[in-house]
Amino acid sequence: MYPEESRGSGGVATVDFLEGTYDYAAPTPAPTPLYSHSTTGCYSAPLDAHGPLSDGSLQSLGSGPTSPLVFVPSSPRLSPFMHPPSHHYLETTSTPVYRSSHQPVPREDQCGTRDEAYSVGELGAGAGGFEMTKDTRFCAVCSDYASGYHYGVWSCEGCKAFFKRSIQGHNDYMCPATNQCTIDKNRRKSCQACRLRKCYEVGMMKGGMRKDRGRVLRREKRRACDRDKPAKDLPHTRASPQDGRKRAMSSSSTSGGGGRSSLNNMPPDQVLLLLQGAEPPILSSRQKMSRPYTEVTIMTLLTSMADKELVHMITWAKKLPGFLQLSLHDQVLLLESSWLEVLMIGLIWRSIQCPGKLIFAQDLILDRNEGTCVEGMAEIFDMLLATASRFRVLKLKPEEFVCLKAIILLNSGAFSFCTGTMEPLHDSAAVQHMLDTITDALIFHISHLGCSAQQQSRRQAQLLLLLSHIRHMSNKGMEHLYSMKCKNKVPLYDLLLEMLDAHRIHRPVKPFQSWSQGDRDSPTASSTSSSGGGGGDDEGASSAGSSSGPQGSHESPRRENLSRAPTGPGVLQYRGSHSDCTRIP
């Protein structure tokens, strides 16, 4: 305890203690304490109840400094002696005055001068705040401050370095969620897959800084224009690096000729970047099945995953450069002819780094032994694993994979007769042009691998020859899936069912009439046409009773009905039935 003594005018010492009761001695024989701990903050006696104060017993802190040893309790009102209504005791002038009013307190009330800091918020919301950020650039990926114009867009040092690392060599980023993670300044490191996807979406490209394409001159010209443009043009300036990418991926409202000219002017390296940016995410089955798997559980898991992947496959196809410029008929025909091949090459690509296993989803990894519980599945598993092993030996690059995947889709128009519709492409020249563009991009990538000309040609042939094996596996898988459908062992979802029926529907009347005229000679088709669908194999005979009439009574599919979302039932139907199981001869 540290007492502090002071002499009043009457010569009586007043002692203030840091602990215990606080006694203010009066000039009486027996000084009485005015308050204690129990009455602190709740004593409300009037000021004149104890008589006038002596001059030395208590003084206002406004008239002189207090000792640093005096303990000041935190209660707002100690007693009428400490806080009389007319004045604030134990308060220095530097302490802010707290009032119950909601109006802001000007600093003139306390210090006599106005504090300039109170107007910072007002200036920040006005013209002064804009002047501070007028020349500030933000990263197009994470919205952090941009350090420069990197890879075709304004970006920060972190996103620039991340994109540089990602485009060098093989990367297998996988999103742990739904490939829709938020990428900003604070969460840009949480998901590499979504960060790389956003880099492609905002227009980052590998050749964005190449001088031989004149990009440096265009960038300098753009910077010069930015300094002369008013503030209202700043959002357009930040989006300008994406103009070329938007023109290449224009919507279906653009005419076919415009889309074709944009493909002609698109360099191969940009085509590769667009193909990589269009890749769908790796999905999760989100179904918990106990092991060991049975035939029903495995087929349920696989058909459910296939239906989910079909939705993402349609989104992927729409992102291919020039695909939306095709007619709706051609888009549907290409997807119907190649959907299982596209899913299979994606499965093979995911399984390259895991020998002996097939990665259907992040939480659905099967080996060859687990596929033996399904009749006929082990053979398909063996072919998939063999193709994955071949790609592993060739050290398939991501750029080569996206090119092969797009080639499968576009080249399927030449085999559209497999769907049974016998309808040719409306604009086969546009499809062939897209196919040539992507093939050129594949050749461009192989030419930059540092191999000799002979090795480049050999590698290109080796990659393209593997596509025939994938088509063979697709046919096997289609047969197996269709047999599962006819046995009614597993439920098939709408989109998967429609895609499957597109390969198994009866052939329309007009193609058989053209065959009878000698345009297309096929003994099997002629016998089938003459028999009216009743002379097929056992499977066709078993389903003849479920048909609503002879084969000639079936109508050709109406493609105009496909303008709605592909997930609805009845996209490709004959008399609204999905029960036709007739095998195509």
UniProtKB/Swiss-Prot annotation:
Keyword Calcium attached: no
InterPro entries assigned to the protein according to its UniProt record, in alphabetical order: Est_rcpt/est-rel_rcp, Estr_rcpt, Estr_rcpt_N, NHR-like_dom_sf, Nucl_hrmn_rcpt_lig-bd, Nuclear_hormone_rcpt_NR3, Nuclear_hrmn_rcpt, Znf_hrmn_rcpt
Location(s), subcellular: Nucleus
DNA-binding positions: 139-204
UniProt GO cellular component terms: nucleus
SMART domains recorded: HOLI, ZnF_C4
UniProt key word Zinc-finger: yes
Residue span of region Modulating: 1-138
Segments of this protein annotated with the region Disordered: 210-264, 511-585
Span of domain NR LBD: 267-503
Superkingdom of the source species: Eukaryota
Keywords annotated in UniProt: DNA-binding, Lipid-binding, Metal-binding, Nucleus, Receptor, Steroid-binding, Transcription, Transcription regulation, Zinc, Zinc-finger
PANTHER family: KNIRPS-RELATED PROTEIN-RELATED
Subunit structure and binding partners: Binds DNA as a homodimer. Can form a heterodimer with ER-beta.
Family of this protein: Belongs to the nuclear hormone receptor family. NR3 subfamily.
Protein name: Estrogen receptor
Gene: esr1
